[in-house]
Amino acid sequence: MMLHKKPVLLLLPIALVIFIVFWVSNRPEKISYNRDIRPIVNNKCISCHGGVKQSGGFSLLFEEEAKRPSESGKLAIVPGDSRNSEIIKRLNHSDTSLRMPLDKEPLTKEEIQLISDWIDQGAEWEEHWAYIPPDPDITPPQTVYSDLTENEIDRFIFAKLEEMGLAPSAKAEKELLLRRLHLDLTGLPPSKQDYENFLADQDPGAYEKAVDRLLSSSAFGEKWASMWLDLARYADSKGYEKDLHREIWKYRDWVIQAFNKDMSFEQFTIEQLAGDLLPNASVSQLIATAFHRNTMANDEGGTHDEEFRVAAVLERVATTFEVWQGTTMACVQCHSHTYDPIRHEEFYQVMAIFNNTADKDLYNEQPKLVTYAEEDKPKIEAVIDYLQTVAPSVPVEAGDGFLYDKAENLLNSLDYRKVSAAEFQDKSSFIELVAHDQKSIWQVQDSSWIMFEAVDLTDVQALSFGYASLYGAILEIRLDEPLGPKIGEVKLGVTAKGFPGNKPEQWRTVKAPIQEVEGKRNLFIYFRKDRHYTQDLLRLDWIFYHQKNPKYLALGHQFTQKLKLLEQVSPEETQILS
């Protein structure tokens, strides 16, 4: 009897081993949420159970939402237990009114099995694949074309060609290589001289020399900057109904120079998003912030400044993420992102960073950086040197290139205060800037007004105005609000026929005495019709504040000559963040 039992005892371990091998070989491989499950969810589930909608209180957008009880109190996903997971029951339900996806094609058996196996394996969630850093230690594949490879990237390309049953093309002729190189790097075809020089150069490094030559050319920056400017929504106009001209070309030049100087992408990013926050920011760094002044501005009459200021801030948030993160963000303004792991509240956390800038959708597009062309700087510096010899010392933030601010501060220290009428801080429903130059205001209608914020009126005795008018008007000077206390008034006469201000002789100067005022007040210029009513009462160019015993009068003719020189040089303006 013992002889018969021994073979049976020997077979038991063998059978156990066979069972284990069979069980292991048939056990499903480790399922990846990103690779296997997320595509199913995005294609067939997320439209009803995600960022926009969360039907039944169930969302597959974030792990904690997917694994918490739904409105029914049931768990859609029970890690390690697909049989008790409500999602599997609903995917397999025979009743079409309860089966998911509702009113759509059911998932295939293979898809349901994948989800079921994933749950049984623990329903492990994974960070979105787009936000997982790539493995820097990937070994380039071996390839039969190893003799053709010149760098590690070539090995990946050749391996893919092998996989697809393709062979690499023959090496291009020198003429074709040069043409490709020129078009790739500069967008311009090579000249006849370029061809002749390249073909005559028998140096093994001739191609590399051509690359270096093109990388150092201004055309390289111009070509590649154009692509970035598209991302920056660059335009020479403001958009919306009037689409008026915008002076922001210095930002375009900054981008070109950044490419040509091979600025690091890190610095390129910092200066555009936060150049104004850098310690002792230079002119160049301030101009870089114009990246986010490319938002549209609405100059249509009757628009609300705050509405379009907020619209610009929202657009800046969306653009920042689209450009630097390669993901849409505008949708998160209303709900969590449908596909990317970005929560609704995170949009407004980012918005808070941008929601502290000074621009307010004004006609004059303040704040602006005012600079001078390189060829004009010596003239301005000469005037400033003179003013500094006669003016009292004033603290001036006059770093790299801030000549305009320095000159303005020096003139103010001499009590010479002349401002552009276009620098108003708020606008009525009718007043606009002259379309072609944006330097003076027009379409001034009866009962319209402009406001200058916190003007120091101490010792100011009168205001002068440079204007042109078809029918004349009455100009009232008021404090604090449009119909606040009136401190002065002046009548403007007729100066022109046709569009006022087109010719120098159409301009006039008028002076209006004002009552004594102490300190800083909001100053309102209120316009009334005279004898006739017309849509456009006048065109206003500048305002001058006359102070008691101004210091500049003591400087006589020489100061006047220097001042004329200063006014002959037109500054350049660029919208910036501040």
Model regions and ranges:
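Local sequence-structure signature of Cys/Sec-based thiol-disulfide redox active-site neighborhoods
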Residues: 30-47, 54-60, 320-328, 340
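C-terminal capping alpha-helices of c-type cytochrome domains
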Residues: 31-33, 103-125, 364-397, 523, ...
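Short, structured secondary-structure elements
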Residues: 21-25, 60, 95-98, 102-104, ...
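N-terminal export/targeting leaders of redox proteins
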Residues: 1-35, 235, 254-255, 259-261, ...
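Coiled-coil termination/hinge junctions
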Residues: 562-563, 567-578
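Extracytoplasmic
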Residues: 392-566
